[in-house]
Protein backbone atom coordinates (compact mmCIF):
# COMPACT_ATOMS: atom_id res chain seq x y z
CA UNK A 1 0.00 0.00 0.00
CA UNK A 2 1.16 3.52 -0.74
CA UNK A 3 2.60 5.13 2.39
CA UNK A 4 0.73 8.13 3.73
CA UNK A 5 -2.81 7.33 2.55
CA UNK A 6 -5.11 8.02 5.51
CA UNK A 7 -7.05 5.08 6.92
CA UNK A 8 -10.13 4.99 9.13
CA UNK A 9 -10.38 1.65 10.92
CA UNK A 10 -13.51 0.29 12.58
CA UNK A 11 -13.87 -3.10 14.25
CA UNK A 12 -17.31 -4.67 14.07
CA UNK A 13 -18.84 -7.08 16.62
CA UNK A 14 -21.27 -9.58 15.23
CA UNK A 15 -24.32 -9.64 17.52
CA UNK A 16 -26.30 -12.48 15.92
CA UNK A 17 -23.72 -14.91 14.55
CA UNK A 18 -21.03 -14.90 17.21
CA UNK A 19 -19.27 -17.84 15.63
CA UNK A 20 -18.30 -15.86 12.53
CA UNK A 21 -14.70 -14.63 12.20
CA UNK A 22 -14.02 -10.99 12.92
CA UNK A 23 -14.88 -8.42 10.26
CA UNK A 24 -12.79 -5.25 10.00
CA UNK A 25 -13.76 -2.23 7.91
CA UNK A 26 -11.14 0.16 6.54
CA UNK A 27 -11.91 3.41 4.75
CA UNK A 28 -9.07 4.23 2.38
CA UNK A 29 -9.09 7.92 1.48
CA UNK A 30 -7.72 8.47 -2.03
CA UNK A 31 -6.58 12.05 -2.76
CA UNK A 32 -7.38 13.68 -6.09
CA UNK A 33 -4.49 15.82 -7.27
CA UNK A 34 -3.49 18.02 -10.19
CA UNK A 35 -5.70 17.72 -13.27
CA UNK A 36 -7.94 15.22 -11.51
CA UNK A 37 -8.71 17.65 -8.68
CA UNK A 38 -9.17 20.53 -11.12
CA UNK A 39 -11.57 18.43 -13.17
CA UNK A 40 -13.62 17.56 -10.10
CA UNK A 41 -13.91 21.20 -9.12
CA UNK A 42 -14.94 22.10 -12.67
CA UNK A 43 -17.67 19.43 -12.60
CA UNK A 44 -18.85 20.57 -9.18
CA UNK A 45 -19.05 24.23 -10.19
CA UNK A 46 -20.82 23.35 -13.43
CA UNK A 47 -23.35 21.25 -11.51
CA UNK A 48 -24.08 24.13 -9.14
CA UNK A 49 -24.45 26.55 -12.05
CA UNK A 50 -26.84 24.18 -13.82
CA UNK A 51 -28.96 23.75 -10.71
CA UNK A 52 -28.95 27.47 -9.93
CA UNK A 53 -30.58 28.06 -13.31
CA UNK A 54 -33.70 26.25 -12.22
CA UNK A 55 -32.99 22.75 -11.02
CA UNK A 56 -32.12 23.14 -7.35
CA UNK A 57 -35.71 22.50 -6.25
CA UNK A 58 -35.98 19.46 -8.52
CA UNK A 59 -34.90 16.22 -6.82
CA UNK A 60 -34.36 14.39 -10.11
CA UNK A 61 -32.10 17.15 -11.45
CA UNK A 62 -30.07 17.20 -8.25
CA UNK A 63 -29.64 13.42 -8.23
CA UNK A 64 -28.54 13.50 -11.88
CA UNK A 65 -25.80 16.02 -11.10
CA UNK A 66 -24.77 14.06 -8.01
CA UNK A 67 -24.53 10.92 -10.14
CA UNK A 68 -22.20 12.71 -12.54
CA UNK A 69 -19.92 13.78 -9.69
CA UNK A 70 -19.94 10.30 -8.16
CA UNK A 71 -18.97 8.75 -11.49
CA UNK A 72 -16.13 11.26 -11.79
CA UNK A 73 -14.87 10.21 -8.36
CA UNK A 74 -14.68 6.61 -9.56
CA UNK A 75 -12.80 7.35 -12.75
CA UNK A 76 -12.56 10.85 -14.27
CA UNK A 77 -12.54 9.73 -17.95
CA UNK A 78 -16.09 8.41 -17.45
CA UNK A 79 -17.15 12.07 -17.28
CA UNK A 80 -14.25 14.08 -18.72
CA UNK A 81 -12.28 12.05 -21.29
CA UNK A 82 -9.57 14.71 -21.36
CA UNK A 83 -8.61 13.87 -17.75
CA UNK A 84 -6.43 10.82 -18.25
CA UNK A 85 -5.60 10.01 -14.64
CA UNK A 86 -7.63 7.93 -12.21
CA UNK A 87 -6.32 7.89 -8.64
CA UNK A 88 -8.92 5.43 -7.40
CA UNK A 89 -8.12 2.90 -10.13
CA UNK A 90 -4.41 3.14 -9.32
CA UNK A 91 -5.08 2.76 -5.58
CA UNK A 92 -7.22 -0.30 -6.31
CA UNK A 93 -4.57 -1.94 -8.46
CA UNK A 94 -1.91 -1.34 -5.81
CA UNK A 95 -4.17 -2.89 -3.19
CA UNK A 96 -4.96 -5.90 -5.40
CA UNK A 97 -1.27 -6.51 -6.09
CA UNK A 98 -0.53 -6.44 -2.36
CA UNK A 99 -3.38 -8.84 -1.57
CA UNK A 100 -2.41 -11.18 -4.39
CA UNK A 101 1.16 -11.22 -3.08
CA UNK A 102 -0.14 -12.29 0.33
CA UNK A 103 -2.31 -15.04 -1.23
CA UNK A 104 -5.61 -13.37 -0.38
CA UNK A 105 -8.67 -13.55 -2.61
CA UNK A 106 -10.88 -10.54 -3.14
CA UNK A 107 -14.44 -9.50 -4.00
CA UNK A 108 -14.60 -6.13 -5.82
CA UNK A 109 -17.92 -4.26 -6.01
CA UNK A 110 -19.01 -1.17 -7.93
CA UNK A 111 -22.44 0.15 -8.82
CA UNK A 112 -21.11 1.36 -12.20
CA UNK A 113 -20.64 -1.41 -14.74
CA UNK A 114 -18.68 0.80 -17.15
CA UNK A 115 -16.17 1.43 -14.37
CA UNK A 116 -16.06 -2.32 -13.68
CA UNK A 117 -15.22 -2.88 -17.36
CA UNK A 118 -12.26 -0.51 -17.03
CA UNK A 119 -11.15 -2.33 -13.88
CA UNK A 120 -11.52 -5.63 -15.73
CA UNK A 121 -9.20 -4.47 -18.50
CA UNK A 122 -6.53 -3.35 -16.00
CA UNK A 123 -6.85 -6.60 -14.06
CA UNK A 124 -6.32 -8.52 -17.29
CA UNK A 125 -3.26 -6.40 -18.12
CA UNK A 126 -1.83 -7.10 -14.66
CA UNK A 127 -2.17 -10.84 -15.23
CA UNK A 128 -4.62 -11.37 -12.38
CA UNK A 129 -7.25 -14.07 -12.83
CA UNK A 130 -10.87 -13.20 -12.12
CA UNK A 131 -14.56 -13.95 -12.39
CA UNK A 132 -17.08 -11.30 -13.45
CA UNK A 133 -20.77 -10.82 -12.72
CA UNK A 134 -23.28 -8.06 -13.43
CA UNK A 135 -26.99 -7.73 -14.12
CA UNK A 136 -26.62 -9.06 -17.67
CA UNK A 137 -25.06 -12.36 -16.54
CA UNK A 138 -27.56 -15.22 -17.18
CA UNK A 139 -28.60 -17.14 -14.02
CA UNK A 140 -26.93 -20.39 -15.11
CA UNK A 141 -23.68 -18.62 -15.96
CA UNK A 142 -23.87 -16.72 -12.68
CA UNK A 143 -24.06 -20.02 -10.77
CA UNK A 144 -21.17 -21.46 -12.79
CA UNK A 145 -18.91 -18.49 -12.08
CA UNK A 146 -19.72 -18.48 -8.37
CA UNK A 147 -18.98 -22.21 -8.14
CA UNK A 148 -15.73 -21.74 -10.09
CA UNK A 149 -14.56 -19.00 -7.71
CA UNK A 150 -15.42 -21.15 -4.70
CA UNK A 151 -13.27 -23.92 -6.22
CA UNK A 152 -10.31 -21.57 -6.41
CA UNK A 153 -10.61 -20.29 -9.98
CA UNK A 154 -9.79 -16.59 -9.86
CA UNK A 155 -7.75 -14.22 -7.71
CA UNK A 156 -10.73 -11.89 -7.52
CA UNK A 157 -14.41 -11.56 -8.37
CA UNK A 158 -15.60 -8.34 -10.04
CA UNK A 159 -19.29 -7.67 -9.40
CA UNK A 160 -21.89 -4.97 -9.79
CA UNK A 161 -23.27 -4.04 -6.38
CA UNK A 162 -26.88 -4.85 -7.20
CA UNK A 163 -26.24 -8.09 -9.10
CA UNK A 164 -23.70 -9.54 -6.69
CA UNK A 165 -24.76 -8.02 -3.40
CA UNK A 166 -27.26 -10.69 -2.32
CA UNK A 167 -28.07 -14.36 -2.65
CA UNK A 168 -24.62 -15.82 -3.24
CA UNK A 169 -21.95 -17.45 -1.10
CA UNK A 170 -18.36 -16.38 -1.77
CA UNK A 171 -16.55 -17.45 1.37
CA UNK A 172 -13.48 -18.37 -0.70
CA UNK A 173 -12.62 -14.65 -0.46
CA UNK A 174 -11.55 -12.97 2.76
CA UNK A 175 -11.17 -9.43 1.41
CA UNK A 176 -13.90 -7.17 0.01
CA UNK A 177 -13.36 -3.87 -1.83
CA UNK A 178 -16.25 -1.40 -2.23
CA UNK A 179 -15.24 1.03 -4.96
CA UNK A 180 -18.01 3.60 -4.51
CA UNK A 181 -20.42 4.39 -1.66
CA UNK A 182 -24.08 3.59 -2.22
CA UNK A 183 -26.78 5.72 -0.59
CA UNK A 184 -27.87 2.89 1.67
CA UNK A 185 -25.06 1.43 3.81
CA UNK A 186 -27.14 -1.73 4.35
CA UNK A 187 -26.63 -2.59 0.66
CA UNK A 188 -22.87 -2.37 1.16
CA UNK A 189 -23.12 -4.56 4.27
CA UNK A 190 -25.04 -7.17 2.26
CA UNK A 191 -22.27 -7.14 -0.36
CA UNK A 192 -19.57 -7.62 2.28
CA UNK A 193 -21.59 -10.48 3.74
CA UNK A 194 -21.08 -12.49 0.55
CA UNK A 195 -17.72 -13.31 2.16
CA UNK A 196 -18.53 -12.77 5.85
CA UNK A 197 -21.06 -15.54 6.38
CA UNK A 198 -21.39 -19.10 7.65
CA UNK A 199 -18.62 -21.16 6.09
CA UNK A 200 -16.02 -18.39 6.34
CA UNK A 201 -13.02 -19.56 8.37
CA UNK A 202 -10.81 -16.48 8.09
CA UNK A 203 -11.15 -12.92 9.35
CA UNK A 204 -12.70 -10.68 6.70
CA UNK A 205 -11.44 -7.21 5.81
CA UNK A 206 -13.63 -4.72 3.95
CA UNK A 207 -12.01 -1.76 2.17
CA UNK A 208 -14.03 1.28 1.13
CA UNK A 209 -12.18 3.40 -1.43
CA UNK A 210 -13.31 7.00 -1.08
CA UNK A 211 -12.15 9.99 -3.13
CA UNK A 212 -10.94 12.52 -0.56
CA UNK A 213 -12.76 15.83 -0.13
CA UNK A 214 -15.53 14.97 -2.60
CA UNK A 215 -19.20 14.10 -2.68
CA UNK A 216 -18.20 10.56 -1.68
CA UNK A 217 -17.09 11.82 1.73
CA UNK A 218 -20.42 13.65 2.09
CA UNK A 219 -22.30 10.42 1.37
CA UNK A 220 -20.29 8.64 4.08
CA UNK A 221 -21.23 11.41 6.50
CA UNK A 222 -24.87 10.79 5.67
CA UNK A 223 -24.31 7.06 6.27
CA UNK A 224 -23.52 7.90 9.86
CA UNK A 225 -26.52 10.19 10.22
CA UNK A 226 -29.28 8.24 8.49
CA UNK A 227 -29.89 4.51 8.63
CA UNK A 228 -32.62 4.69 5.99
CA UNK A 229 -30.62 6.85 3.60
CA UNK A 230 -31.70 5.18 0.35
CA UNK A 231 -35.36 5.77 1.14
CA UNK A 232 -34.70 9.31 2.29
CA UNK A 233 -32.82 10.21 -0.89
CA UNK A 234 -34.92 8.43 -3.48
CA UNK A 235 -38.42 8.75 -1.99
CA UNK A 236 -39.55 12.32 -2.52
CA UNK A 237 -42.98 11.80 -0.96
CA UNK A 238 -42.40 10.59 2.59
CA UNK A 239 -41.95 12.90 5.57
CA UNK A 240 -38.45 11.51 6.09
CA UNK A 241 -37.30 12.33 2.55
CA UNK A 242 -34.19 14.47 2.30
CA UNK A 243 -35.14 17.93 1.13
CA UNK A 244 -33.62 19.42 -2.03
CA UNK A 245 -31.76 21.78 0.31
CA UNK A 246 -30.19 18.84 2.13
CA UNK A 247 -29.19 17.22 -1.16
CA UNK A 248 -27.64 20.48 -2.34
CA UNK A 249 -25.33 20.43 0.69
CA UNK A 250 -23.64 17.36 -0.78
CA UNK A 251 -22.07 19.66 -3.40
CA UNK A 252 -20.23 21.68 -0.75
Question: What do these predicted ranges mean?
Answer:
Residues 1-2, 44, 66, 116, ...:
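Short amphipathic alpha-helical/adjacent loop interface patches that line ligand
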Residues 16-44, 141, 159-242:
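SF2 helicase/translocase ATPase core recognition
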Residues 16-42, 52-168, 238-239, 244-252:
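Conserved Helicase C-terminal RecA-like lobe
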Residues 6, 61-64, 135-138, 187, ...:
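Helix-centric, low-specificity signal for extended rod-like, repetitive segments
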Amino acid sequence: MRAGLPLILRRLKREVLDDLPEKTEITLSVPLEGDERAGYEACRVKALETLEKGGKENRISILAELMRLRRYCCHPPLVLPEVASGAKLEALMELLRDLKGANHRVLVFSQFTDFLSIVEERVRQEGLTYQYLDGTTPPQERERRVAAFQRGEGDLFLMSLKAGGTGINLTAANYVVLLDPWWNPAVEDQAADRAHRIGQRNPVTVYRLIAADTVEERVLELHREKKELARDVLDGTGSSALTPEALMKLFE
